[in-house]
Amino acid sequence: MKFFLLFLVVLPIMGVLGKKNGFAVDSNGKAPECFFDHYCNSECTKVYYAEKGYCCTLSCYCVGLDDDKKVLDISDTRKKLCDFTLFN
């Protein structure tokens, strides 16, 4: 019973503190364009406060963005490609 109550308390907190991945956008709704990973890592960590970033399909893909950051709406195929590239 104690485990169940603990689970009910921790589950909402995990949802609030979650991070997301995606192409972070500026105030104009555009993601930074890129050719090299080091540019994206700098852009994502310093401008958008993500954990890291890299170049995927000529746009900066940020990993570990806060939930309140806006990301570019993309197809599931493109997102899967960038997530797959990240983990391989």
Swiss-Prot record:
Molecular-function annotations in GO: ion channel inhibitor activity; sodium channel regulator activity; toxin activity
UniProt keyword annotation of Metal-binding present: no
Compartment(s) where it occurs, according to its Swiss-Prot or TrEMBL record: Secreted
Record's signal peptide: 1-18
Entry-linked SUPFAM superfamilies: Scorpion toxin-like
Function: Excitatory insect toxins induce a spastic paralysis. They bind voltage-independently at site-4 of sodium channels (Nav) and shift the voltage of activation toward more negative potentials thereby affecting sodium channel activation and promoting spontaneous and repetitive firing.
GO cellular component: extracellular region
Keyword NADP on entry: no
Domain LCN-type CS-alpha/beta residues, every copy: 20-83
Protein name from the UniProt record: Beta-insect excitatory toxin LqhIT1d
Keywords attached to this entry: Disulfide bond, Ion channel impairing toxin, Neurotoxin, Secreted, Signal, Toxin, Voltage-gated sodium channel impairing toxin
InterPro entries tied to this protein: LCN-type_CS_alpha_beta_dom (IPR044062), Scorpion_toxin-like_sf (IPR036574)
